[in-house]
């Protein structure tokens, strides 16, 4: 993967000890205030980063089905909550895919109801006596530390020591090595799609030397091109 990305002149950014979420979150928070940011991901954790200049394109099924999230779309899906409250939801309901335990026995519906009413995990735990249902009260009372830890685990770290000069990460035309490498890897369609977006050293040609039309884009690429051509920072 790294060899291919290098041939496509796409910057690969990694920092030891930090996850990709943390690096993306750092850019989302610390990019210049005028920058518009798009995050393409299959991980809903990134939704906590949504604000007026950050959008998330969530890949629901591979790259063939994408849902665009802004703050309003998030509120529609989460009963009016703000994106920053996603970590409170995860604090209660957990997330097995990220090894976040949550409160055992508290599912998404109950967690959403509690956060809608009390706002944060901390407020839920401070108001256990007011919550109806003996069983739910016991679950919350017996798992306070797990809830607080889960919220912390769900929170994206946004202070990763990375270079924040966006000019260094601008997309460039693909190198001469890109086409033969994609041919070797049998990525015919991928080459055509990225040629349309990025261009290349020898024009728009497919892997077999035939001219490629400008409209030769796949579902995800076409979506991204038509939705947000003016984005300043784009992360996958």
Report the location of each language-model feature.
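Short conserved micro-motifs at the rims of enzyme active sites and ligand-binding pockets
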Residues: 164-166
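Long, highly charged low-complexity segments
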Residues: 168-236
